[in-house]
Amino acid sequence: EELRKLSNFKISLILNKQNYGIGGSFKILFNYLKSKDFSYWINLQSSGRYDASQVLSNLFEIQSTKTDIDYYLHSRFLKPEDSKKYNFIRKIANHFFIRLTKICTNCNFSDPGMSVFMISKKLSTVLLNKEFTQLTNDSHFPHFMNVVLYKYLKEYKEININWKEGNVKSHLNSLSYPVLLLINLINFKFKGSFIKYNKKNEFDYEKLDFDKIA
């Protein structure tokens, strides 16, 4: 029903000229949205891991009664039954890194690696700050973004999401991903920031390499 309502809206597609990774694509989106007029924007990415229409319905229902909340973050781990169909090893690894994230960064999200969220226009302006644009362009970006964003939050709400294995094989490397996450969290603990791997992570927003099709 919610998706049918959205069908009447104008849809813009941003087609990147190359693969910038999830972090790079987020940064391009942040810059694109800065001149747009809206109250909130929603990020959905799934590969069949959850019911997107149910997520939208929940967000619209909750937001209609709460106007002072800047950030709504979905969590796989608020209720045990929400991750029953999720890979057991990945679930254990997630719980380990969630606890480690709290210890190293003081970020108290129950699922800091989650990238299904709704954010207000007011709060999203901070996403153009250097501490976000200098984050990695790779798959760790949502986790790092949530950690850095946490300190800006006055009011936020976590919403449970029913999560399962998707219909597309995970692209995450089971060895390098946790190792790099561990190194970055330790770096944050002692230096107060994540590792800046190289200059290419920070986009020149005046020279973005993408085609926008409305």
Predicted segment positions?
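Acidic donor-binding segment of Leloir-type glycosyltransferases
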Residues: 1-14
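Aromatic/hydrophobic pocket-lining residues that form π-stacking "cages" and hydrophobic walls in ligand
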Residues: 3, 58, 145
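Hydrophobic helical membrane-anchoring modules
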Residues: 7, 130-214
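Conserved beta-strand segments of alpha/beta enzyme cores
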Residues: 10-12, 108, 155-157
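Acceptor/aglycone-binding surface of glycosyltransferases and processive sugar-polymer synthases
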Residues: 16-35, 40, 52-135, 139, ...
